[in-house]
Amino acid sequence: MAGPGLEFENEIADLEEQIASLERNTDRSEEIDSAIRSLRLARVAKLKETYSSLDPWQTVQVARHKNRPYTRDYLNLAFDEFVELHGDKHFGDDRAMLSGFAKLDRFKVMVIGHQKGRTYKERAACHFGCAHPEGYRKAMVKMKMAEKYRLPVICFIDTPGAYPGIGAEERGQAQVIAESMFMMSDLKTPVICVVIGEGGSGGALGIGVGDRVAVLQHAYYSVISPEGCAGILWKSHEHAPKAAAALRFTSDHLLRLGVVDDVLEEPLGGAHRDHHQMATRMKTYLSRQLSELEEMPVDLMLEQRYEKFRKLGVFLEES
């Protein structure tokens, strides 16, 4: 599933090309098989070396990889009996926001998540994962439905940010994101949020208030994109790598700062290389968290959720 390589993966791509070339050889010999084994070992070693030392800008590139698993991929691989629900009961159906009933092991759940699309046609229809106000209203309607039927809510976050167009602003983009966060803070059912790729600004926060907030190892969660930050501070997108380093939005920083509760380890070389393995890890994590949350009294759950987000950004200075 890896697909086109990233710029910093050139050596890995060369090894994979050599392996593929030898495997296509119809006249296989022990010498060729031995060479394939050696190249595979070299590939694994290079993947470990590369992915154990990604810089923040490289992490952004991995998070944006076109073959990275999206919300619908997790629905297909980790969940059963998904029934999609459409519309916001107000304006329309935003394809950048998926929602519906599903089963995860023994749990009946409501799944909500950003969707980017694979082909250009799909991406355009999904606005490249940038939801409009109707997308967030759609999410809120489905969350209230989940609360009514006492279903846990699982949110998959993967967006560069909320859609920035004039129509979205006219229909109350900022207000609806604030309303969604407010509603989620008091939703009387367990909520688990996972950043699976890009966690961009208010677009991510709009479905990001939960009892558990996790991030994939090579995802990022930020107040602004590196390009946006570079454009504001240095008037040029060329400084995006510098901005990425300054924003401290990678999984290790997020965990250390208390922005997320857990980091989900990705398969070697990133989630885009093995959708099935990543989906299995996701399923295990979600099932474990749901088992813990179902035992918690609702009042205590809401109190802990509220305190979790009240503490974000608080720091003490020594005089």
From Swiss-Prot:
Residues 31-292 form the CoA carboxyltransferase C-terminal domain. GO terms for molecular function: acetyl-CoA carboxylase activity; ATP binding; carboxyl- or carbamoyltransferase activity. Disulfide bonds: none annotated. InterPro entries: Acetyl_CoA_COase_a_su, ClpP/crotonase-like_dom_sf, COA_CT_C. It catalyses: N(6)-carboxybiotinyl-L-lysyl-[protein] + acetyl-CoA = N(6)-biotinyl-L-lysyl-[protein] + malonyl-CoA. Pathway: Lipid metabolism; malonyl-CoA biosynthesis; malonyl-CoA from acetyl-CoA: step 1/1. GO terms for cellular component: acetyl-CoA carboxylase complex. It is found in: Cytoplasm. GO terms for biological process: fatty acid biosynthetic process; malonyl-CoA biosynthetic process. Keywords: ATP-binding, Cytoplasm, Fatty acid biosynthesis, Fatty acid metabolism, Lipid biosynthesis, Lipid metabolism, Nucleotide-binding, Transferase. Its EC number is 2.1.3.15. Belongs to the AccA family. Component of the acetyl coenzyme A carboxylase (ACC) complex. First, biotin carboxylase catalyzes the carboxylation of biotin on its carrier protein (BCCP) and then the CO(2) group is transferred by the carboxyltransferase to acetyl-CoA to form malonyl-CoA. HAMAP family: AcetylCoA_CT_alpha. Acetyl-CoA carboxylase is a heterohexamer composed of biotin carboxyl carrier protein (AccB), biotin carboxylase (AccC) and two subunits each of ACCase subunit alpha (AccA) and ACCase subunit beta (AccD). This is Acetyl-coenzyme A carboxylase carboxyl transferase subunit alpha. It comes from Rhodopirellula baltica (strain DSM 10527 / NCIMB 13988 / SH1). The lineage of its organism: Bacteria, Pseudomonadati, Planctomycetota, Planctomycetia, Pirellulales.
